[in-house]
């Protein structure tokens, strides 16, 4: 059997198993679905040290390949990030059951009532880059909503994804749900992604979570409906009536909390009436943190920094760089 045929056969098996498991999961009670999330959280806590040591191996390999600092940041796991994974699972477990919820009740002139009911989609394919915590986050949301999932993480996080997936399997087994409710593509072969996007017999929707290139590739190649996002060029606007200290704290946190995530601020907009009083102290604060600042002409009149060019207003830096405009 050729390599390509082996990949196709492997991916079809994963898709078929996920589809079969989705029928069981769709009928599972909310108590059982919540129990699976609680047991997964428990398994992650019990395997914390293994997860951290395995993640170190991924980090070492990534550094050997001279992967950029933004990706390294997204790849890294530590105790705080594992705590966030565990708390995220518990938060999802505590959410109301979305399955079977009735919305938009519309009576008709004939007396017939038309309602919308939330039901599971079936099997969700999720393709993501770098961040191993997405393995737990994505699985949690799918399980809560009664959907099986087929996960394909980035090759740089393969070892971390596998150890977290093992925790997912333990939680599913303990809750009595099929372990195939959450499938992980264990090969880093790019052919697997292309094959996944052609599994329209088994998958009902595909969700990409990553950079513009990944989203575009999936949009172009997929035979399956795609739920996608756009560039993460996040802006913060400080209005003239804003509390100065609170505005500074929010802007500083929005940029420096984590540089390498799509939710990080890339452009700061400041109302002209408060720019003179706000900018000097705010720029000093950013500079003390090592953030490179790029400003418009009006900004340069108030604080010394690099002159921004037109591309800066449409760039997702994923780095300690910030554009400021008045």
Residue ranges and their predicted role:
Residues 1-114:
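N-terminal Rossmann-like NAD(P)+-binding subdomain of aldehyde/semialdehyde dehydrogenases
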Residues 8, 17, 130-133, 137-145, ...:
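ALDH superfamily catalytic-core signature
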Residues 29, 33, 146, 206, ...:
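Residue-level signal for inorganic ion chemistry
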Residues 36, 188-191, 277:
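Short, conserved clusters of charged catalytic residues that mark active-site
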Residues 40, 156, 266-270:
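Conserved short loop/turn motifs at secondary-structure junctions
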Residues 94, 103-241, 245:
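Rossmann-like NAD(P) dinucleotide-binding subdomain of oxidoreductase/dehydrogenase enzymes
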């Amino acid at each position: 059997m050729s390599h390509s045929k082996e990949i196709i056969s492997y991916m079809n098996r994963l898709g078929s198993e996920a589809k079969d498991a989705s029928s069981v999961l769709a009928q599972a009670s909310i108590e059982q679905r919540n129990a699976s999330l609680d047991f997964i959280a428990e398994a992650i806590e019990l395997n914390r040290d293994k997860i951290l040591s395995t993640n170190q191996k991924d980090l070492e390999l990534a550094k050997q390949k001279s992967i950029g600092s933004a990706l390294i940041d997204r790849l890294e796991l530590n105790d705080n990030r594992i705590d966030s994974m565990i708390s995220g699972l518990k938060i999802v477990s505590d959410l109301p059951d979305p399955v079977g919820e009735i919305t938009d009740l519309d009576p008709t002139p004939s007396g017939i009532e038309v309602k919308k009911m939330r039901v599971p989609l079936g099997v969700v394919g999720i393709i993501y880059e770098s961040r191993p915590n997405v393995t737990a986050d994505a699985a949690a949301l799918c399980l809560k909503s009664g959907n099986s999932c087929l996960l394909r993480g980035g090759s740089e996080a393969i070892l971390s994804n596998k150890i977290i997936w093992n925790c997912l399997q333990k939680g599913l087994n303990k809750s009595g749900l099929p372990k195939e409710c959450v499938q992980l593509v264990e090969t880093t072969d790019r052919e697997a992604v292309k094959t996944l996007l052609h599994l329209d017999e088994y998958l009902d929707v595909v969700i990409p979570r990553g950079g513009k290139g990944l989203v575009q590739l999936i949009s172009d190649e997929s035979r399956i409906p795609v739920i996608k996002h756009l560039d993460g060029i996040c802006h913060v606007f400080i209005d003239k009536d804003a509390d100065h200290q609170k505005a500074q704290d929010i802007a500083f946190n929005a940029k420096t909390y984590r540089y390498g995530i799509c939710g990080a601020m890339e452009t700061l907009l400041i109302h002209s009436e408060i720019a003179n009083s706000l900018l000097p102290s705010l720029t000093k604060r950013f500079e003390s943190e090592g953030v490179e600042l790029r400003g418009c002409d009006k900004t340069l009149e108030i604080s010394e920094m690099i002159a921004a060019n037109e591309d800066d207003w449409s760039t997702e830096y994923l780095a300690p760089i910030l554009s400021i405009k008045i």
